[in-house]
Amino acid sequence: HADKGAVQVGGTSNVSELVQHFGLPAGDRLAGSAAWKSSIDIKHHQTDLVIESDLLGVSSRLPEPLAKAATSPLALRVEKTTAEAGRQQYRATLGNVAQAVFIKRAEVLERAVVALGTGDASLPERGVAVRIAVPQFDADAWKELLAGSGNGNGGRGSKSLPALDVVSIKTPT
């Protein structure tokens, strides 16, 4: 048997189907379809995955800086790797707009960071951090989104968001 292998695949996915399948929060604010490509690497019984898309054809009614017209490309890269001690690391990069890193062990979130704009994307020692550094930040729009009072299903049917341990927001004065 082989100890390593690689697979390259691609296709087009509809955002509403992904939202429904994964229970993504605020999924009612995303629409459209986009082409994607993926590479799966298997080495020594560990699987690493990379998914990339230009999100052309997907629109977002999320608050800035995550709003996007369907006709505008925005590079998305999602990586899943096996980290130390059986942990899984998930890293997502959305152009120069956002980054996120999640560390999970046995499907339990151990620590994570979400960074918008030029926010620091380093993982906290423990818990969940959100760091935002953008020219303008609409706190009311984000509060509405996080409260689940947006348009559409109002957040019903989506997975709940974890409690935040660190929140940092920086805007020019």
Indicate where each model-derived feature is located.
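Membrane-proximal interfacial segments on either side of biological membranes
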Residues: 1-90, 102-173
